[in-house]
Amino acid sequence: MVTRVGDVFLLLGLVILFNTFGTLRYSELFNHPDLFNPENAESVKWATLCIFGGAVGKSAQFPLHFWLPDAMEGPTTVSALIHDATMVKAGVFLVARTYPLIVLSPDTAVYIAVTGAVTAFVAASMAMVMNDIKRVLAYSTISQLGYMFLALGTGAWAAWHAADHGLEVHAQGYMAGLFHLMNHAFFKALLFLGAGAVIHSVHTQDMREMGGLRKSMPITSTAMGMGVLSIAGFPLMSGFWSKDEILESVHKNGEYDGTFGALWWLALLTAAMTAFYMTRLWMMTFSGPETRVVEKMVKSKDHSETVSYTHLTLPTTPYV
């Protein structure tokens, strides 16, 4: 039912576009002779806002964010593939695909950026207090999706004001958002696969019943440690480069608009919160003495299938 709200907004946006320009083909919309007509500015604004409303429902952005943690009930392998690499990214891709329309509406760009930043912060605050390992990763996914929307909104606003403020690097936000989308697909899939290995071994998702698994599952603990470093933005890891680009693009906009200055501080705080709750996840799962549940249930074999994803979170110099 929650995603149906987004579906309604998406449908309204498509209706407005078709009623205004008579087509829904990207190639025809982006080259339509009336696209820059001032009389159509209001229609473009409402159409892009409604399309973003569809993305909010699909990519679990505030206030339609609460469905995603409940949708993580399937196997972690499914969550790694669908919920982190493909399905929930559809909203982000939709906004990126309709970018030539969004840059024509600075109001929509600001709304996208604010929604993304607020979502990133709210979801991170929830992840900090969760004890279910899969729910921590689920709220982390929502938070990182918010980062992507923040970057896309920032880039669109910069593109509109490029002539006024000389923002020649207005594409930085757009590229940073898509770069983070690709990075997140890999390191979050790694984290979910590692979490699945842990759950399969101890038969519980409650991190309070875990602990000390580093000794009995050294490969899984190392692989998840690499994923934690990447999502936390540790220097030279893939997540560091994309998060740095996002923060830089928001900071540059903040020099000309106070709203983006506030969003930069919020995004920076969220980055610190991300490092905290992901470190908390690893420490509660792998460090300290073994709990009774671990001593009783863990098997003396490691799950090496997560290793194949580890190298994807290592330094990605060729992409920079």
Where is each model-derived feature located?
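...captures the hydrophobic TM-helix bundle architecture rather than a specific catalytic motif
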Residues: M1-L312, P318
